[in-house]
Amino acid sequence: MKTAITILMITMAVSEFSASQNVNWRSLRDDQNNLVQFNFGYDYGVTAGMGYARTFSAIRPVLLGLDISLPMGNNLSDDFKVRLGGQIEIVEIAGFAATVRVASVFRKYHNDFVNIASFGSDFGIVAGYSAPTWSIGGEFGFDKAITSHLKHAAIMKEMFPDIKDGWYVPTGGNYYYGLAAGKTLGETYDLSLRLGATRAQGNDENAILPMYLQLGLGARF
């Protein structure tokens, strides 16, 4: 019972997929190295977020960035997610391109029973067609909590005296797959859409509504 409760607590904290900035490499100008994005959507609940990223020229185009997302609610500091990572376009042929994303993820989750801090990783790939004013493609990724620290409330310790605070290593993660599209507005702004499904590794902890939706507005400068 104690093990099952611990697994459930960690699953509650890390079940959301890793949202990230959409980038259309074809729409970026040489004098636009900075990107900011604001997004809103559904991610195991209604969420909002913002992020900043900067592009660099290497062998292939590279984007490094930081973003934060929070659920819509009264106590925004109780639950949040911070991602630090990068994207690189690995191939481009006549507008058809593939981009790889890698990020480290920190999550905080709190309720009346437990406070959880989780460190994890996210790996994804986006492949599709990009033109200077629009893009569309498919994405696939895997989001995994590497380790989580649980601090249980007094009520939990009263109900389950053997339960322990400390670090735990989850055994699973979450796959996500879906559509990624974008539309350039003028010389500076971009609209983006991400829509897809999520699936827990092992199919044993899937969400009641296993999907995600993200609408974003970005600016390049």
Q: Which sequence ranges carry the predicted segments?
A:
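Membrane-embedded beta-strands of outer-membrane beta-barrel proteins
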Residues: 50-52, 82-86, 123-125, 177-179, ...
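Short glycine/proline- and aromatic-enriched beta-strand/turn motifs that initiate or cap beta-hairpins
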Residues: 18-73
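Transmembrane beta-strands of outer-membrane beta-barrel pores
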Residues: 40-46, 54, 68-74, 88-90, ...
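Cleavable N-terminal export/targeting peptides
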Residues: 1-28
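Residues that define the transmembrane beta-barrel architecture of outer-membrane proteins
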Residues: 32-34, 44-48, 62, 78-82, ...
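Membrane-embedded beta-strand positions of outer-membrane beta-barrel proteins
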Residues: 36-40, 64-68, 98-102, 136-140, ...
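Strand-connecting loop/turn motifs
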Residues: 31-35, 45, 57-63, 91-97, ...
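Outer-membrane beta-barrel transmembrane domain signature
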Residues: 114-208, 219-221
